Amino acid sequence: MVNAHEAVRPTGLCRTWPNMIGNESAMGTEFRGRINPGHTTILPFTRLQGGPMDYTPGIFETDMSKNASWSKEKMRHTICNQLGLYVTFYSPLQMAADFPEHYEPFMDAFQFIKDVAVDWDTSIYLMAEPGAYIVTARHPKTESLNKSAEGVGNLKDGKKGVVSNAARYVYGLPEDATAADLKGKKAKDVWYVGGVTDENGRVVSVKLDFLKAGKTYEAVIYADGKDASGLVNWAGADDGKYNPQSYTITTKKVTSKTTLKLKMAPCGGFAVSIREK
């Protein structure tokens, strides 16, 4: 498999060569302290038209001096902004790009990275204004998952087989599930919703009318906290409100008639995992 980084021009080669699963070809997360926060709301309409993009999301520690003592930069995003990118950006190989020790204090938020799928059969851009914000809903390739599960679940040594975290979530299996637990299982109806915004905080109303009518789902909502903010200038100075690691996690029952009212902090975002009960 090839996942090319730096300036490889995206021309849709992955459609000809399926082992070309993605490339960067964008100012990725390592530039997050210097680029306009609205950059990530533009890329779905520009760079991503040329194929999958490995943006290396998932940076929870935004103070760059923790990684490089000489740096005074602070990244311009919140934790929930980073979670939202796993949905708004398409890449069949996603990264958890931070140091493991930076995730340890936030394992409840890291759960979304474990649960989110990486390949989709349906993608819906629910609302967007390039340069300002974007909200995307995606549905994993459950038909392919079911075919894989049928084969893997029948392996003689299936109890030794590892089940990916995303597959575990889609099938409603426990954390310690093995390949043998997939036998006879069918994927539940699962959706993921992600949103990110620029330096302006905003509230969006997300209709869940893409869910199956008459079905009840459980939604886990990862949202910016009331005091969250990822807004900071290029020199690393802030207005005293910089609080990128503030977030809330709530669980609620939803249906196709539900509308979620979700707040995004400045440079913030949200992520929602939705699974049929």
Positions of predicted regions on the chain:
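Aromatic- and carboxylate-enriched substrate-binding clefts and catalytic-loop regions
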Residues: 1-76
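Conserved, mostly hydrophobic/aromatic
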Residues: 2, 88, 193, 267
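Acidic/polar loop patches that form or flank catalytic/metal-binding clefts of enzymes
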Residues: 2-6, 29-34, 92-106, 113, ...
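Flexible loop/turn segments at secondary-structure boundaries
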Residues: 9-14, 62-64, 95-97, 104-107, ...
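C-terminal and late-domain segments of enzyme folds
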Residues: 46, 72-105
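Glycan-recognition and catalytic regions of carbohydrate-active enzymes
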Residues: 99-192, 238
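C-terminal beta-sandwich/jelly-roll accessory domains of carbohydrate-active enzymes
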Residues: 146-186, 198-277
